[in-house]
Curated annotation (Swiss-Prot):
Pfam family, one: Acetyltransf_1
Protein name: L-2,4-diaminobutyric acid acetyltransferase
Taxonomic path: Bacteria, Bacillati, Bacillota, Bacilli, Bacillales
SUPFAM superfamilies given in the database record: Acyl-CoA N-acyltransferases (Nat) (SSF55729)
EC number: 2.3.1.178
Molecular function via GO: diaminobutyrate acetyltransferase activity
Family: Belongs to the acetyltransferase family. EctA subfamily.
Length: 189
């Protein structure tokens, strides 16, 4: 099966290039542990987001995700310090989808493949045994996330379809871009 990133028609569209050249990843530090979050990790997730360009949610959101969605969230720690996370959930109406809400990686770990390792950990969990698609929304300017999900499609030798999800006019104010849905799959032929 060929890896494809298919663009669907949408206002202000752009072309996704599935052949993006990326530098080889730096070595991931072997002192990093990857696992399920606890409620105590919620504050550290929020702090990591606050130091980045990610959309900031309330601290409550991160604590709640750790409490009620620990099976579909992943944290990475270096010497007990949180250096990365994924928050995700399986939509009740689409049990074959894992929706990735947010991925955060500390600046000390960027470019080392940590985000990919976090996604692989998530997909390999028992709770995702019936998951055949990974979905996420990504803004047009977020090239790093676009490349991450395109890489995931290549790793699974599957498709990456891109379509409009939420147009910019749905967001209050003038500073939020449209959100595009990236749908990777099927993961299992």
């Amino acid at each position: 099966m060929q890896v494809q990133c298919n663009e669907k028609a949408f206002k202000g569209g752009f072309i996704i290039n599935s052949q993006i050249a990326t530098a080889p990843p730096k070595t991931l530090d072997t002192t990093i542990t990857i696992g399920k979050p606890t409620v105590e990790d919620g504050a550290a997730m929020w702090e990591l987001v606050n130091k980045s360009t990610l959309d900031t949610n309330s601290p409550y959101k991160y604590i709640m995700m750790c409490e009620y969605f620990a099976e579909t969230c992943v944290v990475a720690k270096e010497n007990e310090r949180l250096v990365g996370f994924v928050t995700a959930f399986i939509p009740p109406e689409h049990q074959d989808v894992i929706f990735v809400w947010q991925i955060g990686v500390d600046s000390s770990q960027r470019g080392k493949g940590l985000a990919s390792k976090l996604l692989q950990e998530l997909i390999s969990r028992d709770i995702c045994s019936n998951v055949n698609y990974v979905e996420a929304t990504v803004t047009p300017s977020n090239k790093a996330s676009q490349a991450l999900f395109q890489k995931l499609a290549r790793e699974y030798n599957t498709q990456c379809e891109v379509s409009e999800c939420f147009s910019e006019d749905l967001f209050p104010g003038d500073d939020h871009e449209a959100e595009l849905t990236f749908r990777i799959g099927p993961l299992h032929p």
